[in-house]
UniProtKB/Swiss-Prot annotation:
Encoding gene (name): claV
A single Gene Ontology CC term: RQC complex
Location relative to the cell: Nucleus
Protein name per its UniProtKB record: Probable transcription factor claV
A Pfam family recorded for this sequence: Tcf25
Main location: nucleus
Bias-annotated ranges (Basic residues): 70-79
Organism lineage string: Eukaryota, Fungi, Dikarya, Basidiomycota, Agaricomycotina
């Protein structure tokens, strides 16, 4: 007796019966095949339970379709029996598809399983997407705000370096300790025209004599030096500054992309446009330019390497760090700003030329580095006591009004952290600050909305000064620094407990006020220190760099300082300067855009190009004669007559006529001994003997014409970054293959005809001849 068929086999039999009743032979053959399948199922019953529904469907499909090996065996043994048993399955279902639409059972199961699998994959994909969105919900700007851009960038670098294949594909990464070089930056060489050297012993002694300092054997003073090409670039930069055209800076970067003064000037241009991201990108590039010039002996971590601010070559680096620290404060990265301010202070702590200490009294508390401020204050206070009788113009932080108040607040914060309810040390420090610098009290009270007694408000020592018209330089500096500290640091005192502590301390200290407050030793030492010009200029320069935020404090700067000769690239040079951008500094320097002697190959190439531009030989000779007859005019076009012809075809006729007319009248735009095409006032600006600053140019008629085909595109691609001075000769094949479009010569012909007469132009075979009127006989024989 055959075994009982399973449910699947029974379902197949029911489907076959519903098709219309097969013949008896088909029934017999189907029974035989069912028996064969049953035997196979019994043989593999142990593993049949492990099969999935999809695998069962495949097995059933294979059973219903003829196999090649089985078909050959069936042909030998049974003949046509196997095809008869398979006929109802293969041929009948398509014919009866209208009456029984549910015939393909197994493909339907497969579709259902496929749909379920796709649904599961879609759900898993949604889960992964939700996870990714949850991870990215914290904006990178917030991460930078809380942790600083340095930490976020370091995290990115770590994750990027985890994949070995991607790191191997990176070409060469620019390294820097001060910035994060971007992939969009130009290619950089080793030094980029800058080098650094140690000051000689005689130079160091001269500096100590100028500053009235004692020699410190442990310190080492350095200065940056310019190469010949970098100095030529700086001279062209000064000429562009005097022209007042910001577009000229892009032409300079085409010659030397890594020029710090140009980068800082472009940064100011973008800052005035309120494009702060692009502005700080140029500041980063300027820092990177100087950092590459520092050799291994000049390190920031030793604390003994100094950069001489009296040399103009070093001053762009000071300015770049100051602007970087200021922008970091604007972005809320106070800890990074604190580190940059410390770096700025360490370059020249005895002069502090950019007033880094005026940043640090605020940033130390804001960044949670109050202990550092206390340590520095105590160190210089001890030095002040040991050298009490020595006259020294070195800057001392313990004598500054902002540091005295910041020290009292730092002690108060530490006492609150240690749960010290007595506050003896902080109150004593605050009383000392109030008695030494009472000018801060009314300013800070107004910012904190603290009411002061009338006896204090009306006292002469608590008077609020708004300018320096009736004050001595040292007293004016005291009120200037008082305003500066309150305007920057009043937010640190906004806490209710700090306001109450400040109000109660002031009221209790001055419960009975005499007509004149006794002066303290700290107050007298401050006035003595700021009687020297170097500390005064440090405070003035600090305000001038931060012009946008502290414009109203300019009233404390003397008039002769504001009227002094200075530029945005070098704000307020020090009175003890050794070098500055003047005629002596640029002596023997070649003009970067001057007309140089062209080689034979270049002259031959120019002739071929000019033939393509101006096919008329007679007119071409006339144009060459005019160009060679006016060397001052030719100096405006470093590319030679070809560049002049190209520009002439692009300029309007009236502009070109004015240029040539000015040259034909004697070249009034050029000054004796000046650079070709330089701005009026440039020579006076470079002259050290000039007292008053020359006004910038109102027009640009005498400006040098510089043809630059690609500006930002070439710079971003690194074009010109590695160009050397000796790579100026082009290959002959390139000159021959270069396509030059003919230019319309009618404009030049008309202009030259006005200067040299209309009958001097030779006969021309071009079609333009018919458009011109017949020549006129000037002799009157018509």
């Amino acid at each position: 007796m055959p075994p009982r068929p399973n449910k699947r086999q029974q379902r197949e039999q029911e489907e076959l019966e519903s098709l219309g009743g097969p013949s008896h032979e088909g029934e017999v053959s189907s029974e035989d095949e069912v028996a064969k399948r049953s035997v196979k199922n019994i043989a593999g019953a142990g593993f049949a339970a492990l099969l999935t529904p999809e695998e069962d469907g495949q097995d059933s499909g294979d059973a219903g379709s003829p196999q090649p090996t089985r078909k050959t065996k069936k042909k030998k043994k049974k003949g046509p029996a196997p095809p008869r048993s398979q006929t109802p399955v293969m041929t009948e279902p398509p014919q009866s598809s209208r009456t029984s639409p549910n015939i393909p059972v197994h493909p339907k199961n497969e579709k259902k399983a496929t749909k379920k699998a796709k649904a599961r994959e879609k759900k898993a994909g949604k889960d992964e997407l939700d996870k990714a969105l949850a991870e990215l919900s914290v904006n990178e700007a917030e991460m930078r705000k809380f942790f600083g851009a340095k930490v976020v960038q370091a995290n990115k670098s770590t994750s990027a370096g985890a994949s070995g294949s991607s790191s191997r594909r990176k070409p060469g990464v620019l390294r820097s300790n001060l910035t994060h070089p971007q992939p969009s930056w130009w290619a950089a060489k080793q030094r980029e025209g800058l080098s650094i050297r140690v000051l000689t012993e005689s130079e160091t002694e001269a500096k100590m004599e100028r500053q009235k300092w004692d020699t410190n054997e442990e310190e080492k003073w350095w200065t940056v030096e310019y190469s010949k090409k970098y100095k030529s670039m700086t001279m062209a930069f000064m000429q562009t500054v005097m022209s007042g055209d910001p577009e000229g800076f892009w032409n300079l970067l085409g010659k030397l992309p890594w020029h710090a003064d140009t980068l800082l000037q472009l940064s100011e241009v973008y800052r005035h446009r309120e494009e702060y991201a692009q502005a700080m990108d140029f500041v980063d590039r300027a820092l990177f330019t100087y950092e590459r010039s520092f050799i291994g002996a000049f390190t920031f971590t030793s604390g003994l390497n100094r950069l001489d601010f009296d040399h103009v070559e070093n001053r762009p680096f000071f300015l770049a760090i100051h602007r970087q620290a200021t922008d970091l404060q604007r972005r809320g990265c106070v800890r990074t700003a604190f580190e940059f301010a410390r770096l700025l202070y360490s370059l020249d702590p005895w002069n502090d030329p950019h007033g880094a200490l005026f940043h640090l009294d605020f940033l130390a508390l804001k960044a949670g580095m109050s202990q550092w401020l206390l340590d520095v204050f105590d160190l210089f206070a001890a030095r002040k006591e040991t050298e009490a009788g020595v006259r020294d113009s070195r800057l001392n932080p313990s004598l500054l009004p902002g540091w005295s108040y910041a020290r009292a607040l730092a002690l108060r914060i530490d006492e609150d952290a240690n749960k010290d309810g007595i506050h003896t040390a902080s109150t004593s420090a605050l009383i000392e600050a109030i008695t030494s610098f009472p000018s801060v009290v009314p300013l800070l009270a107004d910012k904190l909305d603290v009411s002061l007694p009338t006896s204090i408000r009306s006292h002469r020592n608590f008077r609020i000064e708004t300018d320096s018209s009736s004050l001595s330089p040292s007293v004016a500096a005291l009120h200037l620094l008082s305003h500066l500290y309150v305007q920057r640091s009043f937010s640190l005192w906004k806490d209710a407990a700090h306001c109450a502590w400040f109000s109660s301390t002031v009221t209790s200290t001055f419960s009975s006020v005499s007509s004149v407050l006794p002066t303290t030793d700290r107050h007298n030492q401050f006035l003595s220190l700021y009687s020297n010009p170097s500390p005064q200029y440090s405070a003035y320069r600090h305000i001038m760099v931060l012009e946008a935020s502290y414009r109203r404090l300019f009233s404390f700067i003397p008039r002769h300082v504001l009227n002094a000769k200075s530029l945005a690239c070098d704000p307020l040079p020090p009175p003890t300067t050794v070098t500055e951008y003047n005629q002596a500094f640029f002596a023997g320097t070649d003009d970067l855009f001057a007309l140089r002697s062209r080689t034979r190959q270049e002259r031959v190439a120019d002739e071929r190009r000019l033939e393509r531009l101006i096919p008329d030989a007679a007119f071409r000779g006339q144009l060459q004669a005019f160009f060679e007859a006016h060397p001052n005019f030719a100096e405006r076009f470093p590319g030679g007559i070809v560049q002049f012809a190209q520009i002439a075809g692009q300029l309007p006729e009236d502009v070109l006529e004015d240029m040539m007319l000015a040259e034909a009248m004697g070249g009034e735009g050029l000054q004796d001994g000046g650079m070709p095409g330089q701005m009026p006032g440039f020579a006076d600006f470079m002259n050290e003997g000039v007292d008053e600053r020359q006004e910038p140019l109102a027009g640009v008629d005498n400006a040098p014409i510089r043809l630059v085909d690609h500006r930002q595109e070439n710079l971003d691609a690194g074009v010109g970054a590695g160009a050397d001075e000796d790579d100026e000769v082009e290959d002959d094949d390139e000159d021959e293959d270069e396509e030059v479009a003919p230019m319309p010569v009618r404009v030049l012909r008309n202009l030259l005809g006005r200067f040299w007469g209309g009958n001097t132009v030779a006969e021309d075979s071009s079609d333009d001849e018919g458009d011109r009127p017949p020549p006129v006989d000037d002799g009157g024989v018509d």
